[in-house]
Each structure stands twice: as structure tokens, then as C-alpha cells.
Amino acid sequence: GVIPCGESCVFIPCISSVVGCTCKNKVCYRD
């Protein structure tokens, strides 16, 4: 995960996980 998805995942999971984003350091990233 190197590209920020512009979404945080402090309280809820990454909604953007449907496009390959994963939670890292409270922020959603994708490869």
C-alpha cells in the first residue's frame, strides 16, 4: 500500500477496500 486512498480507517474499515485499499496507520492505501 503506497497510494493514499483519501480515506481514514480509525473508526470504520476502508470502504475503498472494494477497489483494493487496505488500512495502514489509520489511513487507507492501495498498491
Curated annotation (Swiss-Prot):
Q: Which UniProt keywords apply?
A: Disulfide bond, Knottin, Plant defense
What the protein does comes down to: Probably participates in a plant defense mechanism (Potential). Binds to and induces leakage in phospholipd membranes, particularly ones containing 1-palmitoyl-2-oleophosphatidylethanolamine (POPE).
**What the record says about its domains?**
The presence of a 'disulfide through disulfide knot' structurally defines this protein as a knottin.
For the cross-link Cyclopeptide (Gly-Asp), what are the residue positions?
Answer: 1-31
Regarding how it is modified after translation, the entry says: This is a cyclic peptide. Contains 3 disulfide bonds.
Protein name listed in UniProt: Cyclotide mech-5
User: Disulphide bridges in this chain?
Assistant: 5-21, 9-23, 14-28
Query: Does the keyword Disulfide bond feature in the UniProt annotation?
Result: yes
